[in-house]
A protein has these predicted regions:
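A general structural signal for well-ordered alpha-helical segments in protein cores
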Residues: 82, 104, 164, 173-176, ...
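C-terminal long alpha-helix characteristic of the crotonase
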Residues: 141-146, 197-246, 259, 275-283
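Glycine- (often His-adjacent) and acidic-residue-rich active-site loop
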Residues: 49, 71-113, 126, 154, ...
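Well-ordered beta-strand positions
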Residues: 139, 178, 182-184, 190, ...
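CoA-thioester-processing core
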Residues: 107-115, 121, 127-181, 194, ...
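Conserved CoA-thioester-binding segment of acyl-CoA-metabolizing enzymes
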Residues: 7-72, 283
């Protein structure tokens, strides 16, 4: 599948002028590709609209169980397009309102609240907004050639788009301050050591590894279980352990009433692959 998949993607990229490509691949993987390879997939307003349209499509599709995001060409996402940044007004408009809304819109933190797992396949440079997008995904697999940088401090900016929330949770406060203030470039091996990425693989194997992992989730794991677990991990972070434990008891009771539980037990006893239903909207 992976070799054929890459050929299909290359053909799609050559024929399609969209800034984001979307394809559903068996066994239920939505593949979202940032598609401005000539600009290292630098983020634009149009890309943002198309990206979240693709996310919405994947969430609404009962066949989709896992979402994978990657970049076309050599880069993952080089951050906000410099042409877009140069178009941002540096002064208030005449009516006293801030006119600098060119980069506004739906925010990357939405990814932490959707019901399906999102995996970033970081194939190259991830900088600024591109780094934030990857960090807001639930997991990150990186090519061994991938690079990461916050970049904001070297542009006279601040910790944007919620990176001050997500980065310390992944790498700790001291490392987060180092990366934010210095904007230094971090290679994939160091990023994994810090906890920024889950796994580093040879660049030519990245998509094979990611798609195999995503396929395992899609075929063998309860979508409703993944949805609840995702909500627990993000929601329980600031709770005390006693509250989180009590909440888990309630959620466990609810899980016993879903068909996923029966199917999980029966398929195990029958030594067959489970056939879980799509994610339960109430989960």
């Amino acid at each position: 599948m992976p070799g054929v998949l890459m050929m299909r993607l290359q053909r799609l990229r050559s024929l399609n002028m969209s800034e984001v490509l979307y394809e559903v691949i068996e066994p239920g993987i939505a593949l979202i590709t940032l598609n401005r390879p000539e600009r290292l997939n630098a983020w634009t307003g149009r890309m943002g609209v198309e990206y979240f349209d693709a996310i919405d499509k994947a969430v609404a599709d009962a066949k989709v169980r896992v979402i994978v995001v990657t970049g076309a060409g050599k880069g993952y996402c080089a951050g906000a397009d410099m042409g877009t940044l140069q178009g941002i007004p540096t002064e208030k408009s005449s009516d006293g309102k801030d006119d600098s809304n060119i980069l506004e819109g739906r925010m990357q933190d939405e990814i932490t609240r959707i019901s399906k797992p999102v995996i970033a396949a970081v194939n190259g440079a991830a900088a600024g907004l591109g780094l934030v997008q990857a960090l807001m995904c639930d997991m990150r697999f990186a090519a061994d050639t991938a690079k990461f940088t916050c970049a904001f401090s070297k542009r006279g900016l601040i910790a944007e788009y919620g990176v001050s929330w997500v980065l310390p949770r992944l790498v700790g406060q001291a490392n987060a301050l180092d990366l934010l203030m210095s904007s230094r470039v971090v290679m994939a091996a160091e990023a994994q050591q810090m906890g920024m990425v889950n796994r580093v693989v040879p660049a030519d194997q990245l998509m094979d590894v990611v798609m195999a992992y995503a396929a395992d989730l899609a075929m063998n794991v309860s979508p409703s279980s993944m949805s609840v677990m995702k909500r627990q991990v993000y929601g329980d972070y600031d709770k005390d352990v006693a509250t989180a434990s009590l909440d888990a008891l309630k959620l466990m009771g609810q899980s016993f009433t879903r068909p996923d539980f029966k199917e999980g037990v029966v398929s195990y006893l029958q030594k067959r692959q489970a056939d879980f239903p799509p994610v339960d909207p109430s989960a």
